[in-house]
Curated annotation (Swiss-Prot):
This is Interferon-induced GTP-binding protein Mx2. Its main location: cytoplasm. GTP binds at residues 125-132, 224-228, 293-296. It comes from Ovis aries. Residues 61-70, 79-88 have a biased composition (Polar residues).
Length: 714
């Protein structure tokens, strides 16, 4: 028989007040358990089935965790039927409710909470709010008490209702301690906090897990957080208040968390820090439940103020409030048992002239609080499962992709290291080869290496075209200057070959710098791409990565010098002014036809400013030399438009890539350096281990969700 069952069964035999209350006995079959109807003026936000909807799939229609009927059976047969009904409901409860809580507890045990938020109930309160007393009443075990900060680490309190002997287990870091008696709990929690947070008054974000299995506890999992303090005392850090608030906020700000805010009845609720923090992260109170404690300490005449709070008229929370009376310090001194304290609690509310109505409404006593919290948690879990599945799937995929970037673990055997290095170099060389052939895979916003180089070659063609147009635009001036300087005994109108040759050499010489700049630009593009490829494959191996970068740099420098020399050689050869007769003749005739047609039309127009007509005395000479210059530059530009890119592609891409691949293969001959080359960065192995552990627990979580019997029906 559960503690809550015995407590409320006791109520049926407790003495009643002399005042008349016709509906003092409760019939819990009138509505689902722990889901009290709102008092006058109170608006609550219970799970959906409380608002006129049918019970959810995970609760039977006649389900009641406490299963209380105020009418006593009149005969043994009635008792047997009642007991059979109770066992049947309990079996349905075990089938429908327990798996939900076990699922989330198993995910939490796997460490999934490191990766995403799980549905939970977080308990917060100011110091001396009665938070520990509430948790003690729910769990049936004594928790650390005293002045100052008592809860110094988040405590996950997992309560499991089972018909067996009391058992407990505390887990933290690599420690798992079995507990055989409730009296051991307080001592072991203090020991765990000292190990984690140190002896003293410091706090830690590290979790302590306490599991309690007993027939006297509800099925519930809570997270107890440190009490909120405003002023540092004794040896506490001056910012201890900020530290505690930051810790609490990490839990209560999660949308998956139900915030259980514990507030004493004998304080102004508007001044409580805990409720203020809850409102900050949950302004509408959608996931906040208020718990009022210490109703026996309320000053006479202020009871109505407490009732207004309970009726949601003072500080509105959609989920409303519950009120409990737990053991006080005198009760603890007198060693009052928790079971007896529960009976006294029921008696207190039954006989209280103001608060008895709260008992009638199902908003008072620890057993009803336990029932309410269990129902809220189950509903919250079922609501969160589809989103939880998607989050686990997404994080598993991202972790898997990230792990691929770190590669496999480094083998310890020297022979295995060679094969490991061979595989690494093979993959790198394959990517270099794809770059050379223009077959690498790129994302939509990027462009292949060959295409980026081709863009530079396109600019080179524009430079050559601009050079031809420049020659045309200043032809009259240039030819006149060279005619004056180099003309010999030939008559007016005869072409001076020296003039033609000088103009050609001068303007071809102006193309050397643009060609070398194009080489430099193409080299930078190729060099950066090779470096990025090396980083992709070897970034986690600091020595190997640096070695490869050095080889890429050395080879690039040599190839750059060879390509530059060949480009300069090309322009030195261009000074020979040569073109095959059959090729030049065709181009010359075509250009002559175009130019003379243009000049003929211009001569018919007296106002024409054609450059060839500005000096009539030398028109024939200028026109003729212009024809030859135009023809020669047209053909030379075609030659240079291809030849310079050929040189760059061969030396800086093809041969450069081949030499890099060969240099990588030569690394395999340095067997004595394998260990040095494969030395990872300090945090790489740690990251790989972390990601593997993350993937493992997320895989386990996916499996747990898949095996959850109710998941497909949610």
């Amino acid at each position: 028989m559960s503690m809550s069952y015995r407590a409320l069964k006791f109520r049926r035999h407790a003495p009643t007040s002399t005042q008349h209350h016709p509906k003092e006995d409760m019939n819990f079959h009138q509505q689902p358990p722990g889901l009290p109807g709102p008092a006058l003026g109170q608006t609550m936000s219970p799970p959906p089935w409380q608002m006129g909807e049918s019970n959810p799939d995970f609760l039977p229609n006649n389900f009641n965790q406490l299963n209380l009927d105020p009418q006593q059976p009149e005969a043994d047969g009635g008792q047997q039927r009642s007991k059979g009904s109770e066992n049947n409901l309990y079996r349905k409860y075990e089938e429908k409710v327990r798996p939900c809580i076990d699922l989330i507890d198993s995910l939490r045990a796997l460490g999934v909470e490191q990766d995403l938020a799980l549905p939970a109930i977080a308990v917060i309160g100011d110091q001396s709010s009665g938070k520990s007393s509430v948790l003690e009443a729910l769990s049936g075990v004594a928790l650390p008490r005293g002045s100052g900060i008592i809860t110094r680490c988040p405590l996950v309190l997992k309560l499991t209702k089972r018909e067996c002997e009391w058992t407990g287990k505390i887990t933290y870091r690599n420690v798992t301690q079995q507990l055989h008696n409730p009296s051991e709990v307080e001592r072991e929690i203090r020991r765990a906090q000292n190990i984690i947070a140190g002896n003293g008054v410091g706090i830690s974000h590290e979790l302590i897990n306490l599991e309690v299995t007993s027939p006297e506890v509800p099925d519930l999992t809570l997270i107890d957080l440190p009490g909120i303090t405003r002023v540092a005392v004794e040896n506490q850090p001056q910012d201890i208040g900020l530290q505690i608030k930051a810790l609490i906020k990490t839990y209560i700000q999660r949308q998956e968390t139900i915030n259980l805010v514990v507030v004493p009845c004998n304080v102004d609720i508007a001044t409580t820090e805990a409720l203020s923090m809850a409102q900050e992260v949950d302004p509408d109170g959608d996931r906040t439940i208020g718990i009022l404690t210490k109703p026996d300490l309320v000053d006479k005449g202020t009871e109505k103020g407490v009732l207004k709070v309970m009726q949601n008229l003072t500080y509105h929370l959609k989920k409303g409030y519950m009120i409990v009376k737990c053991r006080g310090q005198q009760d603890i001194t007198n060693k009052l048992s928790l079971a007896e304290a529960t009976r006294k609690e029921v008696m207190f509310f039954q006989t209280h002239p103001y608060f008895r109505v709260l008992l009638d409404e199902g908003k008072a006593t620890v057993p009803l609080l336990a029932e309410r919290l269990t129902t809220e948690l189950i509903w919250h879990i079922n609501k969160s499962l589809p989103l939880l599945e998607n989050q686990i799937k997404e994080k598993h995929q991202r972790a898997t992709e990230e792990l691929q970037q770190y590669g496999d673990d480094i083998p310890s055997n020297e022979g295995d290291k060679m094969f490991f290095l061979i595989e690494k170099i093979k993959l790198f060389n394959e990517d270099i080869e794809k770059l050379i052939e223009g077959e690498e895979i790129v994302i939509e916003t990027e462009s292949r290496l060959c295409n980026r180089i081709r863009e530079e070659f396109t600019r080179w063609v524009l430079i050559l075209t601009t050079n031809i147009e420049k020659v045309k635009s200043i032809l009259n001036e240039e030819v006149s200057k060279y005619e004056t300087k180099y003309r010999g005994k030939e008559l007016l109108g005869f072409v001076n070959y020296k003039t033609f040759e000088t103009v050609v050499k001068h303007y071809l010489g102006q193309l050397i710098d643009p060609a070398l700049k194009m080489l430099q630009k193409a080299m930078e593009i190729i060099w950066q791409t090779f470096k990025d490829t090396a980083k992709k494959h070897f970034a986690e191996f600091c020595n190997l990565h640096q070695t490869v970068q050095n080889k890429i740099e050395d080879i690039k420098t040599k190839q750059m010098a060879e390509a530059a020399n060949l480009i300069q050689l090309q322009f030195r050869m261009e000074k020979l002014v040569f073109c095959q007769d059959q090729i030049y003749g065709v181009v010359l005739n075509k250009v002559r036809e175009e130019i003379f047609n243009s000049v003929g039309k211009a001569s018919e127009n007296p106002q024409s400013k054609h450059p060839f007509l500005n000096n009539q005395s030398s028109v024939s000479s200028i026109v003729e030399i212009g024809v030859h210059l135009n023809a020669y530059f047209t053909e030379t530009s075609k030659r240079l438009a291809n030849q310079i890119p050929f040189i760059i592609q061969y030396f800086m891409l093809q041969e450069n890539g081949d030499k890099v691949q060969k240099a990588m293969m030569q690394l395999l001959q340095e067997t004595q350096h394998y260990s040095w080359l494969l030395q990872e960065q300090s945090d790489t192995a740690t990251k790989r281990k972390f990601l593997k552990e993350k993937i493992f627990r997320l895989t386990q979580a996916q499996q747990a969700l898949y095996e959850f019997p109710h998941f497909k029906s949610i």
